[in-house]
Amino acid sequence: SGILLSVMAVGVQAKPETGSGLDKSLLPQPVYSPEPGLVDLYWAAWDLAWGRVKHQDGIPQSPYMDENLWDDTIWIWDTEFMVLFCRYAPSLFPGIQSLDNFYKTILDGEPVSLKIWHPDNPPFFAWVEYEYYKMTGDKRRLEYVLEDNRYLQRHFYWFEKLKRGSSRFSKMPVMLERREKGYLWGDVQSGMDNTPRGRGCNGEMLW
């Protein structure tokens, strides 16, 4: 038997205060009596996530989900994945809102006190926005990214025109290069550095 999740319909615009306790009644409640230790692990994972809701001055969206590595840095790749679990508790975790720190910085030119470590990380924005919508039914969010600001469309064209070696958003240079049959990419920038395919490819992996 698997873990049964009772997903609750909750609001999507709350701004949690990290100093308060995590209200676990607003989270999916797992039922898995054969292995209660796995349920404990589940709750421990949410506690860890709650500890990464961060408030910071000088950024477009605060609070946001922090990756727990460097306080002055955010990653597209990691934030996209965090959105996928934050969608189960949108009233508690600012997952989808955290994407605005990339949209507004890269596309709108808003000042930010954070570095975007690899701006050429895989752009799964459309995928995670859609998965968030399927879970929450938040049509206003879709209007915001697709119609009001056209963030997804604009990011596609921005990504296609990236120049290898540029380093506008952090000291880490872009490794992406558009080729006729795909992208020439680096192992770390593509997110494939811990896979047999990507390990040690040093910017010469063709997608």
What do the predicted segments below correspond to?
Residues 132-143:
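Inter-helical turn/loop segments and adjacent helix faces that build the functional surface
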Residues 72-102:
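Alpha-helical support elements that line or immediately flank enzyme active sites
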Residues 84-88, 127-134:
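Short glycine/serine- and small hydrophobic-enriched flexible loop segments
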Residues 1-7:
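Bacterial N-terminal signal peptides
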Residues 9-11:
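N-terminal signal peptide c-region/cleavage motif recognized by signal peptidases
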Residues 109-120, 157-207:
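The feature captures the catalytic groove of carbohydrate-active enzymes
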